[in-house]
Design a protein with these regions (language model features):
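Helix-breaking motifs and short loop linkers at transmembrane-helix boundaries and internal kinks
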Residues: 10, 31-37, 48, 65, ...
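Paired small-residue
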Residues: 21, 25-28, 36-44, 267-274
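Glycine-rich segments within core transmembrane alpha-helices of 12-TM secondary carriers
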Residues: 71-95, 117-118, 307-317
Length: 364
């Protein structure tokens, strides 16, 4: 429903309000006093943010053809590691410096201050974002026609290769269900390490919140660079599945090696940096697969469905990591589990999605 609303009312009037409400709901976490209040706020936050990511992926298909999509999705998704790169030390500083300021605890200030950028971004989106090329005042008529012609050719290429465009096709397609499973595996790996990375550093390197924040910058910075480089190379060659599978397997191997008991903290940091870079890059390049054969109503519904099913891994993974860590009193089984999820996702990708991207030749 979220992506259908985006098509109906326009991206600027859908994505903008999502970001504003997202920030406000996130900030309301500072008022939480009981477990049930926390669950309620987290549920509302999930409802609000659920339409944002698939909406942006769909929005990018309004502007970029398949041959440029890997680097464009990578550019968008670098916001994830960049937010970790910038946000980790800032979060550490807020927790350390703002504790008891104004009668609030550090974690309460954290929710207030980190909600502000989301609200501001939402306002700017509603004012300045062009929903489609037809709405872009900064394009002249020749540029607009050239872009629209290329997008039409891209859609025609999907249909020629048996692409799906009707709403029901998104749920009847076996490829869509396989992509749900692939994305579930990548999200399992990503969320599991993202939620527990500070705790892992706390047990192996330092207990200082600010230092933990600074150390966390390293994997996020490496991931941002890797995502862009792999995305650009994937678009240049027109190859998708092996780019995705290779970085996923490298990340999985790094997860496995980092799980070796007694591994030195610095070496563990290097391996986790490789693991996070691999998994985030695989998750970024993944979105070139559904947009290669889904179009029209099927694209909106299919992208949202894949994202929704995959994000169940975001709920399950941190829970499983916590349970395994508590049961075995170390994170070795949890890290092995995260690596296994990536390997399964990579195997499915290579087995079922080895077709090269259409229309990869460069145009002036």
């Amino acid at each position: 429903p979220a992506n259908m609303m985006l098509r109906k009312i326009g991206a600027k009037y859908w994505l903008g309000p999502i970001m504003i409400v997202w920030g406000l709901v996130s900030a309301s976490t500072l008022l939480v006093r009981t477990d049930y209040q926390f669950y309620a706020v987290r549920f509302l936050l999930g409802v609000v943010e659920s339409g944002f990511f698939p909406g942006v992926i769909l929005y990018l298909t309004f502007w970029y053809t398949g041959r440029d999509r890997a680097k464009m999705v990578a550019a968008f998704m670098t916001a994830i590691p960049i937010s970790g790169l910038v946000g980790s030390p800032i979060s550490g500083w807020i927790l350390d410096a703002m504790s008891s300021a104004g009668g609030l605890r550090g974690w309460q200030w954290l929710y207030i201050m980190e909600a502000i950028p989301s609200v501001i971004a939402g306002i700017f989106t509603m004012i300045f974002l062009a929903s489609t090329p037809r709405d872009a005042k900064w394009l002249n008529e020749d540029e607009r026609k050239l872009l629209l012609d290329r997008l039409e050719q891209d859609e025609a290429g999907k249909h020629a290769l048996g692409g799906r465009h009707r709403l029901a096709d998104a749920f009847r397609s076996g490829r869509v269900w396989l992509l749900c499973l692939v994305y579930f595996g990548f999200v399992m790996s990503n969320y599991g390490i993202t939620f527990w990375l500070p705790t892992l550093f706390k047990h192996t390197l330092t207990t200082d919140p600010l230092k933990i924040g600074l150390l966390t910058m390293i994997p996020w910075g490496a991931a941002a660079v890797t995502m862009v480089l792999v995305g650009r190379h994937s678009d240049k060659t027109g190859e998708r599945s092996w780019h995705i599978a290779t970085v996923a397997v490298v990340g999985a191997i790094a997860f496995g090696l980092s799980a070796i008991p007694g591994i030195p903290g610095v070496l563990g940091l290097i391996l986790l940096t490789i693991a996070i870079s691999g998994i985030l890059t695989a998750a970024s390049s993944f979105w070139t697969l559904p947009t290669a054969f889904l179009s029209g109503a099927a694209a909106g519904a299919g992208i949202a469905w894949i994202n929704s099913v995959g994000n169940l891994g975001g709920f399950l993974s941190p829970f499983l990591v916590g349970k395994l860590t508590s049961a075995f009193h170390n994170m070795t089984p949890a890290l092995l589990m995260l690596g296994f999820c990536s390997i399964v996702a990579a195997a499915i990708t290579v087995i079922f999605f080895r077709r090269r991207a259409p229309n990869t030749e460069r145009q002036p």
